[in-house]
């Protein structure tokens, strides 16, 4: 196998994720030579604005995809929730490895449970999905925008006027934070995860047969089916960063996929949700999106997209 170059964002989490995946590859192919090339993306350079206002998820992957096309790198290790639902022609997700915990972590300054926070308490999150679902269940709380890496957000919780923050559990775990700092992991009835949350997507060129063969050795087919249902739903709903959208799939012992899709307004007042079972992930994602469109969810999406 030739020497491989992995493209990674420069953040601590991205570099840690990349190294963890490289270790996984070396466990199946010990003689691999792999180097990491750090890439600063537009999303990393914009730290003072809400992502949904400056172009959304694709901000973290466009430059990396360009490096793949230019053959400066061989593969990129993305948090799947940052990857837009349509992959450019010529590139592919070569594998979906094991999924980390897909839920959200609620961290309270005083370790007060979410359901017991006093009226007017301030919760920090940079995600419309989290904000909308929290307001839907706890309309007496206040959502305040927060950006920055995990360390920055944990520091802001202590030094600024936040009573609690909500972060993806996967990032905390990959960075080695212990469960001690987490007040609770929120169940899907409280906070349905983002599409692809906790999963990684390994992107490479579609014609790179040698690499695709290697990647197939660390591919998790069950996780791939789940995230395919989730990402199909995202694509069908035309879900952008302006829209609070969530979706989560699991596989039962009977090998059936159960998928729940959710669309909301940012204020949490309108909610469209549907759960369905099936065996074909693409068909399942489409069926749930059709059900939500029948309920009127697409009107919300059109309205929110037109406002931006």
From Swiss-Prot:
InterPro entries: HemC, Porphobilin_deaminase_cofac_BS, Porphobilin_deaminase_N, Porphobilinogen_deaminase_C, Porphobilinogen_deaminase_C_sf
Stored Pfam families: Porphobil_deam, Porphobil_deamC
Pathway involvement of the protein, from the record: Porphyrin-containing compound metabolism; protoporphyrin-IX biosynthesis; coproporphyrinogen-III from 5-aminolevulinate: step 2/4
Lineage top rank: taxon: Bacteria
Record keywords: Porphyrin biosynthesis, Transferase
Annotated disulfide bonds: none
UniProt-recorded name of the protein: Porphobilinogen deaminase
């Amino acid at each position: 196998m030739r020497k491989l170059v992995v493209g990674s964002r420069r953040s601590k989490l991205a570099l840690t994720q990349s190294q963890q995946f490289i270790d996984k590859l070396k466990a199946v192919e010990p003689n691999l030579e792999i180097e990491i090339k750090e890439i600063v993306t537009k999303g990393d350079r914009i730290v003072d604005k809400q992502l949904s206002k400056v172009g959304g998820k694709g901000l973290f992957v466009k430059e990396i995809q360009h490096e793949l096309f230019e053959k400066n790198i061989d593969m990129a290790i993305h948090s799947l929730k940052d990857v837009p639902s349509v992959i450019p022609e010529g590139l592919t997700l070569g594998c979906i490895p094991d999924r980390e915990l897909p839920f959200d972590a609620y961290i309270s300054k005083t370790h007060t449970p979410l359901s017991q926070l006093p009226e007017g308490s301030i919760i920090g999150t940079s995600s419309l999905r989290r904000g909308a679902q929290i307001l839907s269940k706890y309309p007496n709380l206040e959502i305040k925008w927060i950006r920055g890496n995990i360390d920055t957000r944990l520091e802001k919780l202590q030094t600024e006027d936040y009573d609690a923050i909500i972060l993806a559990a996967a990032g905390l775990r990959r960075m080695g934070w212990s469960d001690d700092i987490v007040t609770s992991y929120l169940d899907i009835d409280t906070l349905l995860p983002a599409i692809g949350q906790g999963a990684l997507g390994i992107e490479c060129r579609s014609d790179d047969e040698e690499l695709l063969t290697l990647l197939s050795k660390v591919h998790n087919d069950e996780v791939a089916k789940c995230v395919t249902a989730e990402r199909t739903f995202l694509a069908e709903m035309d879900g952008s960063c302006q829209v609070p959208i969530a979706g989560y799939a699991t596989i039962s012992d009977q090998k059936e996929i159960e998928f729940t899709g959710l669309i909301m307004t940012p204020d949490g007042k309108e909610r469209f949700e549907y759960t369905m079972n099936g065996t074909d992930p693409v068909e399942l994602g489409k069926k749930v999106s059709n059900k939500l469109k029948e309920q009127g969810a697409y009107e919300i999406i059109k309205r929110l997209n037109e406002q931006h």
